[in-house]
Amino acid sequence: MLQPKRTKYRKPHRVSYEGKAKGAKEINFGEFGLMALDGAWIDNHQIEAARIAMTRYMKRDGKIWMRIFPHMAMTKKPAEVRMGSGKGNPEKWVAVVKKGTIMFEVAQVNEQVAREALRLAMHKLPIRCKFVKRGEN
């Protein structure tokens, strides 16, 4: 699964996903992309499931760029543990996705194939998304 090789801090503060994206708002690498219409924390399993769905549909033709990466550790305390006594242990890795972020890009396939591949990826993600073309968004 996706996770950073090393981090400066083991247990970071929770970064907000509210508001609009500052970067990654335009398609830079491919011809088509998947844009987030909401903000959310997307974990490494969801990103990997979306990537696998796209590659299987495209039958390994074309090229896929993942523009998000799960850099942030999410912590959780065990069940039935009293409040206090410190922050919980790292549970999973998440990417902070804000509204307007381009999450995936696709190239070297026709529009119909790219649209369907990105639609399949959309269903693996916990937020609303839309298909965009280069120069259109």
UniProtKB/Swiss-Prot annotation:
The keyword Acyltransferase does not apply. The keyword Ribosomal protein applies. One of its GO terms (molecular function) is rRNA binding. One of its GO terms (biological process) is translation. It comes from the Bacteria. Disulfide bonds: none annotated. CDD domains: Ribosomal_L16_L10e (cd01433). Keywords: Ribonucleoprotein, Ribosomal protein, RNA-binding, rRNA-binding, tRNA-binding. One of its GO terms (cellular component) is cytosolic large ribosomal subunit. It holds the Pfam family Ribosomal_L16. Binds 23S rRNA and is also seen to make contacts with the A and possibly P site tRNAs. HAMAP family: Ribosomal_uL16 (MF_01342). Belongs to the universal ribosomal protein uL16 family. Part of the 50S ribosomal subunit. This is Large ribosomal subunit protein uL16. The lineage of its organism: Bacteria, Bacillati, Mycoplasmatota, Mollicutes, Mycoplasmataceae.
